[in-house]
Amino acid sequence: MARYLGPNLKLSRREGTDLFLKSGVRAIETKCKIDQPPGQHGTRKPRLSDYGLQLREKQKVRRVYGVLERQFHGYYKEAARLKGNTGENLLQLLERRLDNVVYRIGFGATRAEARQLVTHKAILVNDRVVNIPSFLVSPNDRVSVRRKAQKQSRIKESLQLSAQREELSWLEIDSSEMIGTFKFIPERAVISGGIDEHLIVELYSK
């Protein structure tokens, strides 16, 4: 399945919630009718079956983290193999993705921008270049911006925007040095996003 290249706001409207695909400079409600699906029949809200609800939740989480279907299914299988709660394991794996950590630290205004920084070799993990967005960050890993990329205005602007977000307990951030430390893997209770991972587990368990 190819990566979606269409309007990001359309995806948020499809899911009926902000998927954080835009920078957040303006509230998403000022840009589109978030509670109305796209298309000429958007005002109609058909009642979803249990399967429909499960599918929508999976699509929502995939789009939030920018992961393709095959890769997402792979994360689920790995989550099911690990000890503990499968749903929590799944979200923890997604949170450990390098592009997500770069976004959470604030180097990228969106996960898509963070992914681009990674693929363009602007990001270091423990002082070594890593250009794989799906690379899983481990506790105590240091994620930083390469010195020659630190002059990019978009990174500076993103850090200013991220200062307005809620601080995350599992990250230690030094904005002036453009360094973030992934202190520990977050527990489910502190991972935000309005996600019901149980629906995804039910979907894949069939």
Curated annotation (Swiss-Prot):
<dbReference type="InterPro" id="IPR005709">
    <property type="entry name" value="Ribosomal_uS4_bac-type"/>
</dbReference>
<dbReference type="GO" id="GO:0006412">
    <property type="term" value="P:translation"/>
</dbReference>
<dbReference type="InterPro" id="IPR018079">
    <property type="entry name" value="Ribosomal_uS4_CS"/>
</dbReference>
<protein>
    <recommendedName>
        <fullName>Small ribosomal subunit protein uS4</fullName>
    </recommendedName>
</protein>
<keyword id="KW-0689">Ribosomal protein</keyword>
<comment type="subunit">
    <text>Part of the 30S ribosomal subunit. Contacts protein S5. The interaction surface between S4 and S5 is involved in control of translational fidelity.</text>
</comment>
<dbReference type="GO" id="GO:0042274">
    <property type="term" value="P:ribosomal small subunit biogenesis"/>
</dbReference>
<dbReference type="GO" id="GO:0015935">
    <property type="term" value="C:small ribosomal subunit"/>
</dbReference>
<comment type="function">
    <text>With S5 and S12 plays an important role in translational accuracy.</text>
</comment>
<keyword id="KW-0694">RNA-binding</keyword>
<dbReference type="Pfam" id="PF00163">
    <property type="entry name" value="Ribosomal_S4"/>
</dbReference>
<dbReference type="InterPro" id="IPR022801">
    <property type="entry name" value="Ribosomal_uS4"/>
</dbReference>
<dbReference type="GO" id="GO:0019843">
    <property type="term" value="F:rRNA binding"/>
</dbReference>
<dbReference type="Pfam" id="PF01479">
    <property type="entry name" value="S4"/>
</dbReference>
<comment type="similarity">
    <text>Belongs to the universal ribosomal protein uS4 family.</text>
</comment>
<dbReference type="InterPro" id="IPR001912">
    <property type="entry name" value="Ribosomal_uS4_N"/>
</dbReference>
<feature type="domain" description="S4 RNA-binding">
    <location>
        <begin position="96"/>
        <end position="159"/>
    </location>
</feature>
<comment type="function">
    <text>One of the primary rRNA binding proteins, it binds directly to 16S rRNA where it nucleates assembly of the body of the 30S subunit.</text>
</comment>
<keyword id="KW-0699">rRNA-binding</keyword>
<dbReference type="InterPro" id="IPR036986">
    <property type="entry name" value="S4_RNA-bd_sf"/>
</dbReference>
<keyword id="KW-0687">Ribonucleoprotein</keyword>
<dbReference type="GO" id="GO:0003735">
    <property type="term" value="F:structural constituent of ribosome"/>
</dbReference>
<dbReference type="InterPro" id="IPR002942">
    <property type="entry name" value="S4_RNA-bd"/>
</dbReference>
